[in-house]
Amino acid sequence: MISAPRPAAHQKLPPWLQEGARVFDPGREREAIVQFIGDYEDPATRRFMKNAVFLRPEGGGREWIVAPEALRPADAR
């Protein structure tokens, strides 16, 4: 699979962290699939997060948002 060049804002992220990747979130002790990576402003708190990572459990479920530095690659199956 040939991937498209990363947007400039994403170029400082580790190469394994991209949309569609399976990752592990130690804060929730869960594996998830990366749905989107981008800048995000929480509408409730007005706090801004650069390169927020939107995750969803494999197989579906409720999405959550984490900072990229909080994640690691998921173990191989």
Feature names for model-found ranges:
Residues 15-16, 48, 64:
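Short solvent-exposed loop/turn micro-motifs enriched in small/polar/acidic residues
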Residues 29-43:
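Short beta-strand-centered aromatic/proline hotspots
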Residues 1-19:
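Mixed-charge, Lys/Arg-rich low-complexity intrinsically disordered regions
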Residues 13-31:
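Short coil-to-beta transition motif at edge beta-strands of beta-rich domains
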Residues 2-6, 51-77:
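Intrinsically disordered, low-complexity, charged/polar segments
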Residues 26-27, 48, 58:
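A short, compositionally biased micro-patch
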Residues 41-52:
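Short, solvent-exposed secondary-structure boundary/capping segments
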Residues 19-24, 36, 54-55:
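Primarily hydrophobic membrane-targeting regions of prokaryotic envelope proteins
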